Amino acid sequence: MALNLRKNHQILKIINDALIDLPAPSNISTWWNFGSLLGICLITQIVTGLLLAMHYTADTNLAFSSVAHMCRDVQFGWLIRNLHANGASFFFICIYLHIGRGLYYGSYLNKETWNIGVILLLTLMATAFVGYVLPWGQMSFWGATVITNLFSAIPYIGQTLVEWAWGGFSVDNPTLTRFFALHFLLPFVIVGLTLVHLTFLHETGSNNPLGIPSDCDKIPFHPYYTIKDILGFVLMLSLLVSLALFTPNLLGDPENFTPANPLVTPPHIKPEWYFLFAYAILRSIPNKLGGVLALAASILVLFLTPLLHTSKLRSMTFRPLSQILFWTLVANVLILTWVGSQPVEHPFIIIGQLASFSYFTIILVLFPLAAALENKLLKL
């Protein structure tokens, strides 16, 4: 009898075990689609990014013009650029929903998978930041100046570190060229980390909405979840293409249509929408080092969630108190996002400070307390 190549070939066997014959829980919902959607986002960004890099020039005198040239003179250059810019937004929408799913259903108890996931988020944020600088518009330049300057808050070595990162005494040509190099490199680091993420995931298998072991009821990934994932792909790509074709600049900053000018500061410097919640936390502390620490903590706090899990139940499905807190946290992050887009004046300052305080309080204090109380109420 002939050998089944899919199951015996050294490379195909790995693909088969990850995407075809993978045993998956029979009851995972659409919230489990976002992992594969992130994979599609990553592939889309690498393909469109590669095509853009073929026409881009990483030089302060030419960068802005080269992006304009792409949109005007390159076949479908405008579409490739719009897909790449809006693809980043979809990447972040998917990753935030993916993390929210993990928090809600207790997926963070797969510690290795979760920790690699947080590192992936940090790498994605770094990639998006250096990428936003490349068109060399006003917001690109001033965003780079403001964010890189934060490193100067590090005691003793801060200023040296910033000048080393800039390659000079301000954001200039060396900064742009190294940011382009990093923006080209980091997506491939993300690919590598994704493979590690999947390797750890397949050690334990997927979690499920009930938060209980599902070894007694597994189904093959293909055809069940391949079909389910394809539906997600179609919906997400339809939304992405619609955004890129109808309102490509909806999520961008109009300030970036002006070439970078070190002599003119924009009235309101703010990052892209997906960083606004962290930016609001940074701004809400009236001290440079304190703000930088809070900014870092806003993401790094995710590393602590497995350690703060006090509930005897894994998922929040049967924990109404924790559910209320979870949705309060979601609303809180949305408020932070809104505050981050507003000028630094009353009442936004105090709203931002309250929202920042409640963000950390919910994650570090209220979640563990609510879980302990639920254990008591359920007599667990």
Curated annotation (Swiss-Prot):
Q: Which UniProt keywords apply?
A: Electron transport, Heme, Iron, Membrane, Metal-binding, Mitochondrion, Mitochondrion inner membrane, Respiratory chain, Transmembrane, Transmembrane helix, Transport, Ubiquinone
**How the protein sits in the membrane?**
Multi-pass membrane protein
Mind giving the lineage of the organism this protein is from? Answer: Eukaryota, Metazoa, Chordata, Craniata, Vertebrata
Q: Which protein is depicted?
A: Cytochrome b
Cofactor note (record): Binds 2 heme b groups non-covalently.
Annotated family: Belongs to the cytochrome b family.
Pfam family, any one: Cytochrom_B_C
The UniProt entry lists the main location of this chain as mitochondrion
User: For a ubiquinone, which residues are the binding ones?
Assistant: 202
Q: Per its database record, what is this protein's job? A: Component of the ubiquinol-cytochrome c reductase complex (complex III or cytochrome b-c1 complex) that is part of the mitochondrial respiratory chain. The b-c1 complex mediates electron transfer from ubiquinol to cytochrome c. Contributes to the generation of a proton gradient across the mitochondrial membrane that is then used for ATP synthesis.
Q: Which species?
A: Setophaga ruticilla (American redstart)
Q: How does it assemble?
A: The cytochrome bc1 complex contains 11 subunits: 3 respiratory subunits (MT-CYB, CYC1 and UQCRFS1), 2 core proteins (UQCRC1 and UQCRC2) and 6 low-molecular weight proteins (UQCRH/QCR6, UQCRB/QCR7, UQCRQ/QCR8, UQCR10/QCR9, UQCR11/QCR10 and a cleavage product of UQCRFS1). This cytochrome bc1 complex then forms a dimer.
Gene3D superfamilies with a match to the protein in the record: Cytochrome Bc1 Complex, Chain C
TM ranges are 34-54, 78-99, 114-134, 179-199, 227-247, 289-309, 321-341, 348-368
**One GO CC annotation:** mitochondrial inner membrane
**Residues annotated as binding heme b b566:** 98, 197
Query: Which positions bind heme b b562?
Result: 84, 183
